[in-house]
Swiss-Prot record:
Pathway: Cell wall biogenesis; peptidoglycan biosynthesis
EC assignment: 5.1.1.3
GO molecular function ontology, one term from the record: glutamate racemase activity
GO aspect biological process, one term: cell wall organization
InterPro entries named in the record: Asp/Glu/hydantoin_racemase, Asp/Glu_race, Asp/Glu_racemase_AS_1, Asp/Glu_racemase_AS_2, Glu_race
Designated gene of the protein: murI
Species whose genome carries this gene: Pseudomonas paraeruginosa (strain DSM 24068 / PA7) (Pseudomonas aeruginosa (strain PA7))
Residues annotated as binding substrate: D12, S13, Y44, G45, N76, T77, T187, H188
UniProt keyword list: Cell shape, Cell wall biogenesis/degradation, Isomerase, Peptidoglycan synthesis
Designated name of the protein: Glutamate racemase
PROSITE patterns on file: ASP_GLU_RACEMASE_1, ASP_GLU_RACEMASE_2
Length: 265
C-alpha cells in the first residue's frame, strides 16, 4: 500500500471523537479512517494521567499495527495527559491532538467573559492552565466541570429529560456570570449542541475544535505528501467495551450502521 493510501487512526475515550471523525470525513473524504473508542475505560476525565497515558500508548500501538499513517488524538483529556509522550513514542508519525478552543474564544468574546465546559481532568491539567496564560490573560474565564455528561452522551441520550436537567444545572453558573462565549472542551459535547441551543441565549457563541482539527490534519498530511486521493475505504471501528453497544449508538452519532470490532488491549 502506498503511504498516502494508508488510513488515518483516530481514537478517544469513547464515542465523543466521532464528532471529530465527522469533521475529518467532511473535509478529507478521500481518507480511509480507523476509529477506536476506549469505552471500557470512559470517562478519561476522572482517571489519573498515568492511567490515560498507558491506555493511549496501547491504542496508538494497535492503530499503527493496522497501518495508520497518522494519529488523531480526539480527546481533550488524553491530549493534556499523553500528547507529549505519544510524540516521543512515535517520532515519525504525524500526531494531531485536541485542546480547548481558548484562543478563538478569547478573540470572539465581546464582553470579555468566556465559559468553559470540560472534564475535571482537562480543567486541572497544566496544558489547560498554559492555554489560559497564553491566550486568555485579557478575558475572564469561568470553568465548569461536567461530571456525568459524557456518560449521558455515551448512552445516546442527546435530548432526554435527564440530559436536559444535567445541562441546565451545569450551565447555570456560566449563565449567571454573563458569559457571551462558550467553549465545548470535550469532543463528546458537540453532540448536545442542539439541546444547548434550547438552553442558552441565541447570542452566545458556542465554540468547539473539531473542524480546526480536520484542517490541521489536512495541513500535516499535505506537508508530508500523505494526502490520499481517489476512493476511501469504508471506515473501521473498534471498542474496548461491548461491540453491540457501540453498534447501537453509531447510527445516532455517526449516521450509519457499522460493524464494530472488539479491542483487546
Amino acid at each position: 500500500m502506498a503511504a498516502e493510501s494508508a488510513p488515518v487512526g483516530v481514537f478517544d475515550s469513547g464515542v465523543g471523537g466521532l464528532s471529530v471523525l465527522r469533521e475529518i470525513r467532511a473535509r478529507l473524504p478521500a481518507e480511509s479512517l480507523l476509529y477506536v473508542a476506549d469505552n471500557a475505560h470512559v470517562p478519561y476525565g476522572e482517571k489519573s494521567a498515568e492511567y490515560i497515558r498507558e491506555r493511549c500508548e496501547r491504542i496508538g500501538d494497535f492503530l499503527l499495527e493496522r497501518g495508520a499513517k497518522a494519529l488523531v488524538l480526539a480527546c481533550n483529556t488524553a491530549t493534556a495527559a499523553a500528547a507529549a509522550e505519544l510524540r516521543e513514542r512515535y517520532p515519525q508519525v504525524p500526531l494531531v491532538a485536541m485542546e480547548p478552543a481558548v484562543k478563538p474564544a478569547a478573540a470572539a468574546t465581546r464582553n470579555g467573559r468566556v465559559g468553559v465546559l470540560a472534564t475535571t481532568g482537562t480543567l486541572k491539567s497544566a496544558r489547560f492552565a498554559a492555554l489560559l496564560d497564553r491566550f486568555a490573560s485579557d478575558v475572564q474565564v469561568f470553568t465548569q466541570p461536567c461530571p456525568g455528561l459524557v456518560e449521558r452522551i455515551e448512552a445516546g441520550d442527546l435530548h432526554g429529560a435527564r440530559t436536559r436537567a444535567l445541562l441546565e444545572r451545569l450551565l447555570g453558573p456560566i449563565l449567571e456570570q454573563g458569559c457571551d462565549t462558550l467553549i465545548l472542551g470535550c469532543t463528546h459535547y458537540p453532540f448536545v449542541k442542539p439541546l444547548l441551543a434550547e438552553l442558552i441565549p441565541a447570542d452566545i457563541a458556542v465554540i468547539d475544535t473539531g473542524a480546526a482539527v480536520a484542517r490541521q490534519l489536512e495541513r500535516v498530511l499535505s506537508t508530508r505528501a500523505l494526502l490520499a486521493s481517489g476512493q476511501a475505504a469504508a471506515p473501521r471501528f473498534w471498542t474496548s467495551a461491548l461491540p453491540e453497544e457501540m453498534e447501537r449508538i453509531l447510527p445516532i452519532l455517526w449516521g450509519s450502521q457499522e460493524s464494530v470490532g472488539k479491542l483487546d488491549v
